[in-house]
């Protein structure tokens, strides 16, 4: 999802999306640990998405 699309969402929607991404991150870590993860680039992309969502939540809460 693009950052411009994320900026249009409310804090509640972003929080829900953050929960989903964190669950995905857990699943990716488990797949990596068991050797079932074929595409390792997904781990980095997921971490980046989580960071972007957290940044936007923080910006919206601070009123920036």
From Swiss-Prot:
Which residues does UniProt call coiled coil? Answer: none
A single Gene Ontology MF term assigned here is: structural constituent of ribosome
Which Pfam families does the entry link to? Ribosomal_L29 (PF00831)
Q: This protein's superkingdom?
A: Bacteria
Which biological process, per GO, is one annotated for this protein? translation
Q: Does the keyword Lipid biosynthesis apply?
A: no
Family, as annotated? Belongs to the universal ribosomal protein uL29 family.
Q: What is this protein called?
A: Large ribosomal subunit protein uL29
| Originating organism | Psychrobacter sp. (strain PRwf-1)
The lineage, from the top, is: Bacteria, Pseudomonadati, Pseudomonadota, Gammaproteobacteria, Moraxellales
């Amino acid at each position: 999802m693009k950052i411009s699309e994320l900026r249009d969402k409310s804090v509640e929607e972003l929080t829900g999306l953050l929960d989903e991404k964190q669950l995905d991150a857990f699943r990716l870590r488990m797949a990596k640990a068991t050797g079932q993860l074929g595409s390792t680039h997904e781990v980095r992309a997921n971490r980046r998405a989580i960071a972007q969502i957290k940044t936007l939540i923080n910006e919206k809460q601070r009123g920036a």
